[in-house]
Structure formats: C-alpha cells, structure tokens
C-alpha cells in the first residue's frame, strides 16, 4: 500500500492518495497530535485500486501543528504525519 499526502505542509487543504491491491472495507481518518479523531474521510467497502481524498480545514477549528492520517484496509493499518501551517 502506498499512502501519501500533497502538499505537506498544507493550508487549507491536502490530497491524500493511496493504492490497495485487494478489495475490502477501507477507513481513512485524520487525528490530532493527542490522538483525537478530527475527520473521517472514507468509511466504506472499496475495490482494489488507486484512490485519493481531499482533506480541507475550512469548517474545522484546527490550529497549526502535526496531524496524522490513518488508512485501514482489512488487517492492514498505515499511519502518516502531515503538518498544518497557518
């Protein structure tokens, strides 16, 4: 699985992209530095393939700093870091 976001650092939005080789239930969530869930971008069954979702802070009261995005596909979990610069 290839998981990345661009641009990073970002403000006000970043595109998170990934590829998965198998079909399955996918969840993509964003967390703050304390582990609090900020957003759920994906929570559905998807086929194998390449995907991308945009994370935008427009309606969220988020401060500058480090955030994490986590992709879960079946038993697979990957977490990456991104930085919001205001």
Residue spans of the language-model regions?
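Generic detection of short hydrophobic beta-strand segments and adjacent strand-loop junctions
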Residues: 43-44, 53-55, 80-82
């Amino acid at each position: 699985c290839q998981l990345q976001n661009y641009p990073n650092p970002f403000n006000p939005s970043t595109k998170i992209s990934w590829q998965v080789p198998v079909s399955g239930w996918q969840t993509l969530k964003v967390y703050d530095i304390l582990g609090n869930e900020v957003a759920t971008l994906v929570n559905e069954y998807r086929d194998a393939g390449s995907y991308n979702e945009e994370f935008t802070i427009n309606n969220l009261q988020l401060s500058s700093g480090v955030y994490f995005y986590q992709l879960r596909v079946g038993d697979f979990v990957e977490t990456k870091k991104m930085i919001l610069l205001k």
